[in-house]
Amino acid sequence: MEYNVVLVRYSEIAVKGGYTRSRMERLLLRALEESLAAAGVEAEVERLQGRVLVRLRSPGDAAAAARASARVFGVKSVSPAVEVEYSGIEDLAEKAAEFFGERVRGRVFRVRARRSGVEGFTSKDVERLLGKLLLERGAGGVDLEKPEYTAYVEVRGRRAYFFDTINPGPGGLPVGSEEPSLALYSGGFDSGVAAWMIMRRGSPVHLAFYDFGVPEALEVAVEGAKTLAGEWAWGYRPRLYVVNFRGAALIVNGLVKPSYRTLVLRRLMLLHAQDLAAREGFEALVTGESVGQVASQTVRNLRLISSGLELPVLRPLAGMDKDEIVEKSREIGLYDIARRQVEVCGVDQPPNPRASPQGFRSEFEKVRDIFIPPPRVFDLKGESLHSILKTLGLRG
């Protein structure tokens, strides 16, 4: 028997009610279809009660379909599986034994069964009967606590699904469940993970990169943005806004006292990002700040730079350590790019970790109204990496 379906599970969507649940399930199906198509998998996506079923046209696509499905927000876990029809519990157990028989030969195993919409037998009945058949076919014994192999059976009506792996997905909510947001994105560890975490909560995240005139930093940021979009942004078309901030940095360095320069630049970026978000219809800003990680990210300084903003500033990394952030970057596939990013702050002196509010306001007023050129905008799904870099003057 070859895998002919992929079972897709979700958790948080299941606790929603009525219209909200139905809407989120539709968003999940749309994102799954897009991810599968991008992976070159031909399949039909079908909604079941509490599950999504990916019905494969080619059994050879099972592994690719499972990988693609596990990259969709809202998915708790996925399992390549064999779908069969059965006439009764004996027929079900025989077909399951045909699938699992060689897999458990000589191995200590257990059976885990679930059923829905079935009368006439229980999950325990399935486990006992299948376990008996597998022992007769050469299994090495049963251990319910620490088996070498677990045979999973899920019964739904007159169909059953056999599988032996449960691969985790990202969880969260499908993209589109929440309103769109704009992430201040540098291409480093923090901002990439922050954007991913808000995408995971259902917000279509777009990215704004503030360019201080360092080509290496811009190139890494574009590559990271393309990777984030290409691996995780299913169900929408994320945009990258490249903002020329070189002039702003020069003015700040020339007019603002050294100990306030980083904070003033950060507030300028937040105010500009807020205006950009308002024009584009985004309803929140996202930053990668972690409380106390650097001097500009103390509680006092975070209050100073974001005071009075109309849009909420989402800081999903606020309580995370740097090691946790780096590890999450590795998990989501951004580590190898983010580790190449160069440190660019735009100013030549770190801030006071306990800056004076009065002093900060006084220094910020010196540059409040400086001109910032309109951003260059790129479709991260529709434009190639080479095309974007060429437009930015980073490729011939």
UniProtKB/Swiss-Prot annotation:
UniProt-annotated binding residues for ATP: 184-185, 266, 288, 297
Entry's Gene Ontology BP terms? thiamine biosynthetic process; thiamine diphosphate biosynthetic process; thiazole biosynthetic process; tRNA 4-thiouridine biosynthesis
Q: Which catalytic reaction applies to this protein?
A: [ThiI sulfur-carrier protein]-S-sulfanyl-L-cysteine + a uridine in tRNA + 2 reduced [2Fe-2S]-[ferredoxin] + ATP + H(+) = [ThiI sulfur-carrier protein]-L-cysteine + a 4-thiouridine in tRNA + 2 oxidized [2Fe-2S]-[ferredoxin] + AMP + diphosphate; [ThiS sulfur-carrier protein]-C-terminal Gly-Gly-AMP + S-sulfanyl-L-cysteinyl-[cysteine desulfurase] + AH2 = [ThiS sulfur-carrier protein]-C-terminal-Gly-aminoethanethioate + L-cysteinyl-[cysteine desulfurase] + A + AMP + 2 H(+)
Q: Which SMART domains match?
A: THUMP
Per the record's keyword annotation, is tRNA-binding included, yes or no? Answer: yes
Q: What cellular-component terms does GO give this entry?
A: cytosol
THUMP domain location is 63-166
What are this entry's molecular-function GO terms? ATP binding; CCA tRNA nucleotidyltransferase activity; tRNA binding; tRNA-uracil-4 sulfurtransferase activity
Q: Which Pfam families match?
A: ThiI, ThiI_fer, THUMP
Q: Name the InterPro entries for this protein.
A: Rossmann-like_a/b/a_fold, ThiI_AANH, ThiI_fer, THUMP_dom, THUMP_ThiI, tRNA_STrfase, tRNA_sulfurtransferase_ThiI
Its predominant location is cytoplasm
Disulfide linkages recorded for this protein, renumbered to the chain, are none
User: Which keywords has UniProt assigned to this entry?
Assistant: ATP-binding, Cytoplasm, Nucleotide-binding, RNA-binding, Thiamine biosynthesis, Transferase, tRNA-binding
Q: Where in the cell is it found?
A: Cytoplasm
| Entry's EC annotation | 2.8.1.4
Pathway per its UniProt entry is:
Cofactor biosynthesis; thiamine diphosphate biosynthesis
- Sequence similarity: Belongs to the ThiI family.
Q: Which HAMAP family match?
A: ThiI
Q: What does this protein do?
A: Catalyzes the ATP-dependent transfer of a sulfur to tRNA to produce 4-thiouridine in position 8 of tRNAs, which functions as a near-UV photosensor. Also catalyzes the transfer of sulfur to the sulfur carrier protein ThiS, forming ThiS-thiocarboxylate. This is a step in the synthesis of thiazole, in the thiamine biosynthesis pathway. The sulfur is donated as persulfide by IscS.
What's the name of the protein?
Probable tRNA sulfurtransferase
The species this protein belongs to is: Aeropyrum pernix (strain ATCC 700893 / DSM 11879 / JCM 9820 / NBRC 100138 / K1)
Taxonomic classification: Archaea, Thermoproteota, Thermoprotei, Desulfurococcales, Desulfurococcaceae
Q: Supply the gene name.
A: thiI
